[in-house]
């Protein structure tokens, strides 16, 4: 290799297609002595030492965090053993002064002007004190929330300046991912609206950093990028991201839920192996000691958090939902594996109804499960469990049963005879009887109807063309109105729901549990999409609302109805301010004045690609049209270049 130029002091390795591997600031010169500036002495996170584990201060290169707010570092100076910092609130622009007195043991005495001086530690101490807190009272309460924080070690050269929060309305299956804007100094913030407390995550690349927040709250997070990279280097999904800190009203619950997840891990490898080697009953036995261990851990943690009834409630729900989700997930993919390995005896064994007995111990009537990160998975598995297939099985008849049968005014056998078809004695006898009953409705024994069809089967098979002609000439089926079609659809759904209600009643002691009500709200988008008449749709929603015991479910049902059957169809949508809107407007700016068909898609999304193929003829029709344009938007992450070109 050629020697580097003598003036080169620093080198970087930056890969625009793989920012995770970026390396920068490799120094080729001898480093100066350790930074001994006043800021270097106090730059870190400072935690209370009273047993609460509370993060009170964060001091960094250009910003500081305290009072659940972000401040700009204005000035720092040393006065004897003390270090004084002047800070300016980033929002209100108000200034304040902090005083730091480092101690020999590594702790630090910190004082806000006019407040008591207290001792703080660089390390978060084990929790020994938990503030008393009542259980959830008003769980549903729509309000905005504000998430902010700092990524220590962030540099724009890492190749990203945004993060994501994958938010969802679990009541309606609506997803609304929210962008987190990251400033060059590593601070970040975003605001979003939620309907109830949630456990979610800040997503940076493939790394998910959890948090818990409630409507109306502000939560501040500290993320250590080196800890994120340690997990990435470990190539282990279960490797903990350390040093994360939280500040705000729900900080203690954020710590709790993050740490508790690491105590009740269940690796996918065990699930995958069990699906291929165990029968359903064997898997339930396999899971018993694992779930028992989770519950023991939950009991121990609950003892520490006992003063907070809300914390204890969240702990119990987390164990229950994880256990339930695993028992549901075991049943998935077994049919697929069975097709791959037709000799596997374990895969030939299907679950019986008793497998679902675990549901009686699940919090199906507890709306607070929606705060849990596993809520979406559990509800999805619950509402589509295989046991509900019974509701869709065709009604079977006994040969001795009788049904109402309407005879056509022109019997088929008479039509065939007039066309020159020869009938045998049995067929002629049937024809004469049908002539007498033509146009009437009468009771007929199933056994008799089956016997008659068997006697005419060979004739029907031979005279297919004449039968088609008969159907075209004499079919008396009248054209149904849209209202009739909608009513038939609703009646069919109500029949299935009634059967499912009966199945739920056998599995769970409380009738009409809340999660089953939520499942019915979640199905509204699809059902209302199949009901075209607005009046019928409103009547349908009114009938559904009668079963809801939680008022917020009724209001969400009304909102879905307004979306599918709006009173005012001439509506526009104002795009929210932010980087995403700027990018979108930049994409469409060259098509001003046109009607735009915009499709967001990914190479990994089967329905997306099917939708593109389904509109191929439409694109041909409007190709080069002066007033119409198709725009398809994807990303490098969702559609890698190699797959995109295919």
Predicted region positions:
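Tryptophan-anchored aromatic micro-motifs
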Residues: 1, 12, 16-56
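Signature tryptophan residues that serve as conserved aromatic anchors
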Residues: 1, 46, 55, 601-604, ...
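A non-transmembrane, solvent-exposed segment enriched in polar/low-complexity residues
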Residues: 4, 18-19, 28, 33-38, ...
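Extended hydrophobic secondary-structure segments
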Residues: 25, 583-587, 596-609
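Oxidative protein folding and maturation machinery
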Residues: 234-593
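Conserved redox-active cysteine motifs that mediate thiol-disulfide chemistry
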Residues: 592, 600-620, 635, 639
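Loop/turn elements at helix/coil->beta-strand transitions in domains of secreted/extracellular proteins
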Residues: 592-596, 626-629
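Thiol-based oxidoreductase modules, predominantly thioredoxin-like and allied folds used
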Residues: 625-642, 646
């Amino acid at each position: 290799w050629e020697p580097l130029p003598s003036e080169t002091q620093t080198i970087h390795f930056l890969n625009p297609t793989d920012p995770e591997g970026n390396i920068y600031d490799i120094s080729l010169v001898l480093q100066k002595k350790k930074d001994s500036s006043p800021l270097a002495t106090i730059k870190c996170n400072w935690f209370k030492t009273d047993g609460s584990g509370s993060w009170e201060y964060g001091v960094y290169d250009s910003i500081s965090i305290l009072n659940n707010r972000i401040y700009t570092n204005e000035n720092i100076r040393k006065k004897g053993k003390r270090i004084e910092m002047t800070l300016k609130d980033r929002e209100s622009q108000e200034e304040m002064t902090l005083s730091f007195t480092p101690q020999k043991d590594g702790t630090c005495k910190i004082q806000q002007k006019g407040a008591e001086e207290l001792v703080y530690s660089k390390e978060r101490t084990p929790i020994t004190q938990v503030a008393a807190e009542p259980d959830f009272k008003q769980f549903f309460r729509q309000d905005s929330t504000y998430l902010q924080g700092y990524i220590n070690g962030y540099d724009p050269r890492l190749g990203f300046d945004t993060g994501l929060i994958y938010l969802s309305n679990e009541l309606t299956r609506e997803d609304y991912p929210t962008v987190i804007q990251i400033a060059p100094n590593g601070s970040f913030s975003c605001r979003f609206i939620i309907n109830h407390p949630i456990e979610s995550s800040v997503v940076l690349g493939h790394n998910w950093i959890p948090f818990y927040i409630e409507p109306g709250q502000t939560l501040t997070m500290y993320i250590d990028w080196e800890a994120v990279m340690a997990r990435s280097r470990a190539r282990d999904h279960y490797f903990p991201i350390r040093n994360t800190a939280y500040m705000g009203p729900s900080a203690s619950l954020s710590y709790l839920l993050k740490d508790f997840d690491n105590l009740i891990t269940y690796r996918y490898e065990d699930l995958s192996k069990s699906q291929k080697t165990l029968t359903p009953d064997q898997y339930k036995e396999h899971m018993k000691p694992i779930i028992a261990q989770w519950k023991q851990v939950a009991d121990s943690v609950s003892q520490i958090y006992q003063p907070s009834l809300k914390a204890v409630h969240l702990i119990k729900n987390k164990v229950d939902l994880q256990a339930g989700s695993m028992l549901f997930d075991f049943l998935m993919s077994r049919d697929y594996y069975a097709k791959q390995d037709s000799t596997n005896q374990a895969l030939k064994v299907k679950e019986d109804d008793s497998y679902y007995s675990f549901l009686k111990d699940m919090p199906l009537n507890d709306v607070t499960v929606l705060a849990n990160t596993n809520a979406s998975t559990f509800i999805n598995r619950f509402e589509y469990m295989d046991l509900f297939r019974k509701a869709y099985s065709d009604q079977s008849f006994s040969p001795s049963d009788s049904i109402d049968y309407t005879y056509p005014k022109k019997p088929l056998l008479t039509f065939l005879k007039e066309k020159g078809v020869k009938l045998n004695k049995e067929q002629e006898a049937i024809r004469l009887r049908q002539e007498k009953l033509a146009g009437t409705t009468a009771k007929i024994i199933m056994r008799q109807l089956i016997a008659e069809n068997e006697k005419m089967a060979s004739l029907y098979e031979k005279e297919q063309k004449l039968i088609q002609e008969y159907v075209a000439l004499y079919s008396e089926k009248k054209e149904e109105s849209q209202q009739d079609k909608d009513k038939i659809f609703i009646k069919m759904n109500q029949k299935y729901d009634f059967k499912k209600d009966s199945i739920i009643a056998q599995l769970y002691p409380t009738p009409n549990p809340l999660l089953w009500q939520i499942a019915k709200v979640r199905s509204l988008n699809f059902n209302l999409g199949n009901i075209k008449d607005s009046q019928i749709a409103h009547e349908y929603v009114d009938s559904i609302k009668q079963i809801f015991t939680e008022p917020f479910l009724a209001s969400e049902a009304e909102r879905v109805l307004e979306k599918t059957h709006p009173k005012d169809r001439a509506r526009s949508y104002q795009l929210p301010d932010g980087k995403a809107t700027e990018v979108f407007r930049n994409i469409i700016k060259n098509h001003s004045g046109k009607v735009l068909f915009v499709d967001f898609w990914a190479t990994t999304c089967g329905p997306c690609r099917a939708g593109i193929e389904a509109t191929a003829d439409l694109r041909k029709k409007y190709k080069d049209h002066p007033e119409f344009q198709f725009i398809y938007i994807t990303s490098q992450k969702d559609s890698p270049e190699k797959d995109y070109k295919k």
